[in-house]
Amino acid sequence: MGIDISCLNFIASHKQYVKGKTLQIGRQGLHYAGSWADRSGKKAIISNKILSDHNINFTAQDTVEGGDGHTEKLFKLLGADTVDTIDYSPYEGCTIVHDMNKPVDEIYHDAFDYILDAGTIEHIYDVKTVIDNYKIMLKVGGTIAIITTCNNFAGHGFYQFSPEFFRTVFSKQAGYQQLGLDIYELTSDESFEAYHIAEPRKGDRQEFKTSPNPHYVAFVAKKIKNIDSSNFQQSDYLKVWGEL
């Protein structure tokens, strides 16, 4: 797992929400800064432009220096006070060992101001429990950001996700304010196109035809209040059933 240039752009686009107690779902590597042998290479140049375009006053190289190839320094430079990582195994140096197929311990309830999943959820079997864990670990007023596989990643993980999934499970009715929903088309290892997904008319189905390139879905939302919401239906079917 790691932060590539498209993930960096996504994080930079909502940088103001990275603060306080931050949690990574799986420890993230620095994939955007180029190789360790050439930190001034093309990826680093592109990454620096992304940071500059989002009015961020440090460089990709700053996030690498003095670190071990992971993203804790990036998040602290963005504004996090502490950065924890939860993972199934300690093999990559996580601070919390937990199987996300199971509910998290109460000590992690309402514990974090910012949670980032950058490519983990698609590898976990029990997606409902994963989402429930994210919700219960996030403080009211905190922000959840998820970037995961959307299309042309068959075989990468267990799942690929539709934008509709995140829009539904983190809806206003579930206690969240949507801050951003995008699709990232990976046109090469060093380039991407980002497409903002507008809110559809109530109950309308929103389908997307994509190119043969791999695509991520990227979603960010703010938790407004705690609501016990665990049963969701797709909005266009609710419209058909007369329940919207």
Where are the predicted features?
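Short alpha-helical segments and helix-capping/turn motifs at coil-helix boundaries
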Residues: 3-12, 67-71, 203-205
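Flexible, charged surface loops at secondary-structure boundaries
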Residues: 13-20, 77, 108-109, 213
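Aromatic- and Gly/Pro-rich amphipathic surface segment
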Residues: 31-85
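Class I SAM-dependent methyltransferase Rossmann-like catalytic core
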Residues: 1-20, 29-42
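Short, glycine/acidic-enriched capping/hinge loops at junctions between secondary-structure elements
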Residues: 34-38, 96, 232
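S-adenosyl-L-methionine-dependent methyltransferase catalytic module, highlighting the catalytic core
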Residues: 64-65, 76-78, 125-244
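Residue-level detector of flexible, active-site-proximal loop/helix-junction positions
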Residues: 29, 90-92, 102, 183-188
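Conserved SAM-binding loop
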Residues: 23-25, 66-155
